[in-house]
Amino acid sequence: MIQITVIQIDNYGPWTVTPNPRRESDLQALQSRLYADLNLMFGAHKGLVFYTRFDNLIAITNGIDLITHKRIQESIRNRYPFTVSMVIASAETPYEAQKLATETLQEYGSAQDENRKEVLDVANELVVDGYVQIAHIDINNITGTLTDIVSAYDTYLNVNKVKLALMEELLKYNALLFFIGGDNFMAPSNGMSEEDFLDIFNRINKKYKIELKAGIGIGRTAEDASNLADIGLEKIRGKLVDKNVCTLKQDDFLESKMGMGKIYHPQF
């Protein structure tokens, strides 16, 4: 089971134009700061936040309880000129979890309802003994094939084409995908196999002539899974595996490191 928290700024659209439209540069900076602060706050508890549309964010929050969510919510109220609402849900797949959380939040009223403030609810249950699977996907040799050859905007356009293709393909497996900068994407993907990813990569390569690779991490929290995914991706880059996917599981990884005589102090 994966635990997802949907985060939404309360009544944000009307606030941006009241009493007059606010400077766009200020709004962009404010949204970026909120994303950064939320990642730091949830990250302190081994969670991970993705910005989606900036006024609506999705966080992977396995291991994070309701009290911690409440404290984060209060901290945002104290730091920002607006409030946020949060709903937590769990499911076998990321898409199912975020959908359930979203539907529960919508039951409290519109995102632009001035009377709906600081909703905090659990749609079904908090995850006690679940896991997180995250794939860190990137484009093979984007520097040599795009960055150093075509314009900055054309590279950006191609990256977004790949992003959309990945989002549509992964949705067939009830997985999610988020852009995380450069040519990198992260996909919460509980239940997917390496073969599923290879099939998707082959279809995208046939259509766009772009090769992809992915480290896949499976851990108890978003931080554990994403760290393992990063290590798996480095194994592919270092040609330590013979295919474009590499899966690392938390317990297996810790056992292999301990067996090499290294001392680890995992925080579970």
Swiss-Prot record:
Alphabetical list of InterPro entries matching this protein: GTP_CycHdrlase_3 (IPR007839), Nucleotide_cyclase (IPR029787), Rev_trsase/Diguanyl_cyclase (IPR043128)
The answer on whether this UniProt entry bears the keyword Nucleotide-binding reads yes
GO terms under biological process: biosynthetic process
* Enzyme Commission (EC) number: 3.5.4.29
Reaction it catalyzes:
GTP + 3 H2O = 2-amino-5-formylamino-6-(5-phospho-D-ribosylamino)pyrimidin-4(3H)-one + 2 phosphate + 2 H(+)
Keywords in UniProt for this one? GTP-binding, Hydrolase, Magnesium, Nucleotide-binding
Highest rank taxon of the organism: Archaea
- Does the keyword GTP-binding belong to this entry? yes
Q: Which GO terms describe its molecular function?
A: GTP binding; GTP cyclohydrolase IIa activity
Cofactor dependency: Mg(2+)
Q: What class of enzyme is it?
A: hydrolase
Q: Quote the record's miscellaneous comment.
A: This enzyme couples pyrophosphate hydrolysis to the guanine ring-opening reaction. GTP cyclohydrolase and pyrophosphate phosphoydrolase activities probably occur at independent sites.
Which NCBIfam families does UniProt cross-reference here?
Answer: PRK02240.1 (NF002587)
Q: Which family does it belong to?
A: Belongs to the archaeal-type GTP cyclohydrolase family.
Kindly give the HAMAP family that the UniProt entry links to this protein.
Answer: GTP_cyclohydro_3
Q: Could you describe the subunit structure of this protein?
A: Homotrimer.
Instruction: Tell me the protein's name.
Output: GTP cyclohydrolase III
